[in-house]
Amino acid sequence: MFSIIQKIEKEQIKKNIPIFRSGDTIEVKVWVIEGSKKRLQSFEGIVIAIKNRCLNSSFTVRKISNGEGVERVFQTHSHGIEEILVKRKGLVRKAKLYYLRTRTGKAARIKERLN
């Protein structure tokens, strides 16, 4: 039974996902269906959390839009995600950056990792 589940999960896992960590600025291109139309929508922000659970893996991206914080949780292996682009690598010491929710402006900046 367990090997059957592993086999099905292995078929559904995406192979073209870039390596990114918490603190990185990424752009996620997602398919959006509005009525009968289908288009790509881009969501760019800082990764504040990653959950690695094989096929159930997810990551949370936060951005500031019109002075309001917007967070979105994406399933890593979802068919709705077209591509993930790493724009900038951030230098952080924590895995979960939930403290960014209370910070605004210059206090919410993250240093860049150069390597």
Swiss-Prot record:
Recite the UniProt keywords alphabetically: Ribonucleoprotein, Ribosomal protein
InterPro entries with a match to the protein in the record: Ribosomal_bL19, Ribosomal_bL19_CS, Ribosomal_bL19_sf, Translation_prot_SH3-like_sf
List the molecular function annotations (GO) for this entry.
structural constituent of ribosome
Q: Name one Pfam family in it.
A: Ribosomal_L19
Name the SUPFAM superfamilies on file.
Answer: Translation proteins SH3-like domain (SSF50104)
Q: Name one GO biological process term.
A: translation
Q: Name one GO cellular component term.
A: cytosolic large ribosomal subunit
Cite the PANTHER family for this sequence: LARGE RIBOSOMAL SUBUNIT PROTEIN BL19M, RIBOSOMAL PROTEIN L19
Describe its function: This protein is located at the 30S-50S ribosomal subunit interface and may play a role in the structure and function of the aminoacyl-tRNA binding site.
Annotated family: Belongs to the bacterial ribosomal protein bL19 family.
The name this protein goes by in its record = Large ribosomal subunit protein bL19
Q: Which organism is it from?
A: Buchnera aphidicola subsp. Acyrthosiphon pisum (strain Tuc7)
Q: Which gene holds the coding sequence for this protein?
A: rplS
